[in-house]
Amino acid sequence: MSKLPGINHLVAVRALEKAGFRIIRQGKHIVMSNEERLVTIPRHNPIKAFTMGGIVKDAGLSVEQFKAFL
């Protein structure tokens, strides 16, 4: 499994939208859902690689699948 770079939170939101997630609510964090899973994305830049890896795992995607949506 390859590593994820630290990325901008807006890029992460766009990638998850391509994966079928929709924004549920926004505040200091953005909460997204695909009707099965709930994912929370912090609003700071860049999102560290370790945190981004957890978000991708929570979304039920592999790193390679997520990178394809970037």
What are these regions (language model features)?
Residues 1-70:
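Basic nucleic-acid-binding interfaces
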